[in-house]
Amino acid sequence: MEPGFWHEKWYKQQIGFHQQDINPFLVQYWQRLALPAGAKVFVPLCGKSLDMCFLAEQGHQVIGCELNELAVQQFFSDNQLEMTQTVEGEHQHYQTEQVSLYQGDIFTLPKRITQDVTAFYDRAALIAWPEEMRTQYAKQLANLLPSGSLGLLVTLDYPQETLNGPPFAVSPNWIEAHLTDDFEIQVLACQDVLADNPRFVKKEVPWLNEAAYLLKRK
């Protein structure tokens, strides 16, 4: 996906990928990571996700990376958070007490930004990439994460030929084939969420599975 695709989506506010509620898998399984309250948590392609508020409420320091400037600004304005803005190389850095967002390309995010994180949360990043770019993203994510860091990964899977992504289908087989070199993987849950997603129902997608994985960086 070219950057212009996402910039246009945010400009037109065609952001169906933005969830109005905290992700149920995050609420249900985050405690499985057993992190200390002050742990730093990396959220790639974070948008203006309310999930970051949940993570902050657990006492974590949230570090997000988001391509689009409007998404970052809306996160702070929607949640009535005062922030400071500075420049970090080619990234804009927006910061409030517990949330620090870097606006720019995740592929050029300096590794020092994430060198102290103990965990990560990916709900909308891996599934945002078509297959030819997904492996590149997965390698960059692994590159940014310290060994031993834990993560909660949430994916969607469906017959890809029935719908043009994003979100793109990411199967358990893809996870096994492309993430095992860098991560230990444990499946936490998988359930059909088709009834909760009208866009997929309208396109007559026969099934839609949402899965949660616990990952550990090797």
UniProtKB/Swiss-Prot annotation:
Recorded GO MF terms: thiopurine S-methyltransferase activity
GO CC annotation terms, alphabetical: cytoplasm
Subcellular location: Cytoplasm
Predominant localisation class: cytoplasm
Binding site for S-adenosyl-L-methionine: 10, 45, 66, 123
Disulfide pairings: none
Keywords of this entry: Cytoplasm, Methyltransferase, S-adenosyl-L-methionine, Transferase
Top-rank lineage group of the source organism: Bacteria
Pfam family for this entry, one: TPMT
Keyword hit for Transferase: yes
EC number: 2.1.1.67
Biological-process GO terms, alphabetical: methylation; response to metal ion
Reaction catalyzed: S-adenosyl-L-methionine + a thiopurine = S-adenosyl-L-homocysteine + a thiopurine S-methylether
Family to which the UniProt record says this protein belongs: Belongs to the class I-like SAM-binding methyltransferase superfamily. TPMT family.
Full protein name: Thiopurine S-methyltransferase
Organism: Shewanella putrefaciens (strain CN-32 / ATCC BAA-453)
